[in-house]
Amino acid sequence: PFFIILGWQIINDIKKLKRTIMITLLSVYMIFTIITFPITLPVFSPSFINDYMQSIGFKFKLEKGKEGYVPQLIADRLDWRQFAQKAIKLYNDLPEHEKSRAAIYVVNYGQAGAIELYSNYSVPVISSFNNYWIWSKQKLENVETLMAYGEDKDDFEKAFSEVIDSGVKNQTEFGYQGNRTFYICRNAKFNLKKIWDNEKNFR
């Protein structure tokens, strides 16, 4: 009987210890969630997030090494509509005869997806990033004009004889991919579809 009682007591003590550990871990998790909630989900204004980060002493670095106004996981979710609307307007402002043989080129799938979403998939978008590289190849068949974004002018001049600054700039204080210019590129120096294999950018 003694060993039965002792064993029962040990089992009860283990259950209490496990319960205490679970309660402690849950409490730590809840506290951590409450603290990090404003800086992990885009539900507050950027100014609030920035003030909150400073009040708790948090600092974040952007992928390009710059210290951001807000954390990059927030910054990368902002201003997509504004970016897409600028690209769409630039495309729609082309003459009708040119528009039918034009497309928008961007460097990553986030930009490409935003343009497709906010244009209701009415604007042809080309990107070499991930699956868009596959989807874009067929679109290159008849493209003569590109509204290009995400690289410097001299990069586009390697592929096009005429590269014009459109005067449209994606100005944003959030994220590292903003503050670049849209260029209108015409007169390709070679068949774009033939060089597309070299542009593959899978990550």
Which residues does each predicted region cover?
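Hydrophobic membrane-spanning alpha-helices of multi-pass integral membrane proteins
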Residues: 1-5, 26-28
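Transmembrane alpha-helical segments
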Residues: 3-15
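Alpha-helix N-cap/helix-start and coil->helix boundary motif
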Residues: 4, 111-112, 153-154
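Signature aromatic-anchored transmembrane alpha helix within multi-pass, membrane-resident enzymes
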Residues: 12-53
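Short basic/hydrophobic patches in alpha-helices and adjacent helix-turn junctions
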Residues: 13, 114-117, 151
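Short periplasmic/luminal acceptor-recognition loop of GT-C membrane glycosyltransferases, typified by
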Residues: 37-42, 46, 51-133
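Aromatic/acidic, Gly/Pro-rich catalytic loop(s) in extracytoplasmic/lumenal soluble domains
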Residues: 82-86, 91-95, 120-203
